[in-house]
């Protein structure tokens, strides 16, 4: 994974995931060339499939954000898994993707930081709405 170009998304729905992400960043950042966020998990996965990124990880995603991207990465010969290394990304919303070597190392780092609370999927249709802004 040394020198890899990675992509991820940042937690925006729940602050408990922030510590989870920061722990991963502390371990991944020194090993990677760069970590980017384009704003779309679908695009990040497409770039991973195309070889622009060497790997991608993000959690608590919705099926419509990852369905096509999972297929693209797999068709390109990459590996996509959930945090258990299994085939449950679509159901769990947790995605780790990349070529075999990057995927293996990235998954090991993420699993060291994983906790049930940090990666529990949030249904965006039931997520708490932000407080209204009053002038």
Labelled PLM ranges:
Residues 1-135:
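An extended, acidic
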């Amino acid at each position: 994974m040394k020198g890899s170009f990675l992509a991820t998304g940042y937690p925006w729905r729940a602050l408990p995931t922030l510590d989870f992400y920061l722990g991963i960043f502390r371990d991944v950042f020194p090993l990677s060339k760069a970590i980017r966020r384009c704003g779309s998990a679908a695009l990040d996965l497409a770039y991973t499939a195309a070889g622009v990124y060497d790997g991608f990880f993000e959690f608590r995603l919705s099926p419509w954000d990852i369905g096509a991207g999972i297929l693209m990465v797999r068709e390109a010969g990459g590996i996509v898994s959930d945090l258990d290394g299994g085939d449950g990304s679509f159901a769990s919303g947790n995605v780790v993707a990349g070529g075999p070597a990057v995927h293996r190392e990235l998954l090991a780092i993420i699993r060291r930081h994983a906790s049930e609370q940090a990666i529990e999927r949030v249904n965006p249709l039931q997520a708490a709405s932000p407080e209204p802004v009053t002038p």
